[in-house]
Swiss-Prot record:
Residues 194-264 are annotated as: Small ATPAse domain (RuvB-S). Its main location: cytoplasm. This is Holliday junction branch migration complex subunit RuvB. InterPro entries: AAA+_ATPase, AAA_lid_4, DNA_helicase_Holl-junc_RuvB, P-loop_NTPase, RuvB-like_N, RuvB_C, WH-like_DNA-bd_sf, WH_DNA-bd_sf. It comes from Variovorax paradoxus (strain S110).
Length: 354
């Protein structure tokens, strides 16, 4: 049997992916980030909590309690870490869980922090157990134990640290160990944004990019952005390109609609991968329930990518259900794809009684 290698080729980058597409895009994101809480749009409850906690810490001239931010990618966890440091008037040191391979990597960061500084660890759920063990006394007592020497002559010494705030970010809060999770005094979940909130973000970003955009054009981009600011800003830049080449440079509702159709982003913000996932569940697995590994194999995508990037929005919007027995396509998914659901589902009841 001949195997076509194209069947196993990685999927092309998605314009509606919440992950940064390139270092260049990360640089653009940094330029568009709000710098202070007053500039931050959305996440009203989280913003209010941080205003109070930061204000209290600043008033007492103490380090802010350690903060855990979790939620789907692209919702502003990194942005909030920068804002927290800016509001406190302290330095920010940034790293990620996979980078901290050895205890000495973390020790080097911790011992160089100044009083009340913020240490931001992205993907904190990916810290190795040995590094995580070093972090516990640092978070509780502002102390770390490090080993000096090797072999029989090795000994442990205790180093005092300056008070600091750890801001941890993760898309997989369930993968955090209980001891680590319990050491965060402030825990905040970031939710998907409403189209109205994203329209404000698009308008702000358009102003910074000097893009002429009317309200209807901005809202057309916002409503297809999957509740995610990173996607909204990316779509804004792609629609800007279309407007400059196919129009007069101004983003109107019509221009935005045509550009997004060209990009294969439908009115719900779904792209080819979203539709492939829903079609696979409906057509290949009779609507489900189907296990995640089977779904991943059927559409040629990584399990983690489906779970972290594709699924959350489909579930949040009510097109997919995650059950103990597997994934199930909802009636909304059938309607969106123009497929007649089985009679047992047409009345709103699940085919499998789940």
């Amino acid at each position: 049997m001949t195997i076509q290698t194209d069947d196993f080729a990685p999927a092309p980058p998605r314009v509606v992916s919440a992950a940064p597409a390139s270092p260049q895009e990360e640089a653009i994101e940094r330029a568009l980030r709000p710098k202070l809480l007053d500039e931050y749009v959305g996440q009203a409850k989280v913003r209010e909590q941080l205003e109070i906690f930061i204000g209290a810490a600043r008033k007492r001239k103490e380090a802010l309690d350690h903060v855990l931010l979790f939620g789907p990618p692209g919702l502003g966890k990194t942005t909030l870490s920068h804002i927290i440091a800016a509001e406190l008037g302290v330095n920010l040191r940034q790293t990620s869980g996979p980078v901290l391979e050895k205890p000495k990597d973390l020790a080097a960061l911790l011992t160089n922090l100044e009083p009340n500084d913020v240490l931001f660890i992205d993907e904190i759920h990916r810290l190795s157990p040995v590094v995580e063990e070093i972090l516990y006394p640092a978070l509780e007592d502002y102390q770390i134990d490090i080993m000096i020497g090797e072999g029989p002559a090795a000994r442990s010494i205790k180093l005092d640290l300056q008070p600091f705030t750890l801001v941890g970010a993760t898309t997989r809060a369930g993968m955090l160990t209980n001891p680590l999770r319990d050491r965060f005094g402030i825990v905040a979940r970031l939710e998907f944004y409403t189209p109205e909130e994203l329209a404000l973000i698009v308008r702000r970003s358009a102003g910074l990019l000097k893009v002429d955009t009317d309200a209807a054009g901005g809202f057309e981009i916002a409503r297809r952005s999957r509740g995610t600011p990173r996607i909204a800003n990316r779509l804004l830049r792609r629609v800007r390109d279309y407007a400059e080449v196919k129009g007069n440079g101004r983003i109107t509702e019509d221009i935005a609609h045509k550009a997004l159709v060209m990009l294969d982003v439908d009115p719900q913000g779904f792209d080819l991968m979203d539709r492939k996932l829903l079609e696979a569940v409906i057509h290949r697995f009779d609507g489900g329930p189907v296990g995640l590994d089977n779904v991943a194999a059927s559409i040629g995508e990584e399990r983690d990518t489906i779970e972290d990037v594709i699924e959350p929005y489909l579930i949040q919007q009510g097109y997919l259900q995650r059950t103990p027995r597997g994934r199930i396509a909802t009636l909304a998914a059938y309607r969106h794809l123009g497929v007649t659901p089985p009679s047992s589902r047409s009345d709103g009841q699940d085919l499998f009684g789940i």
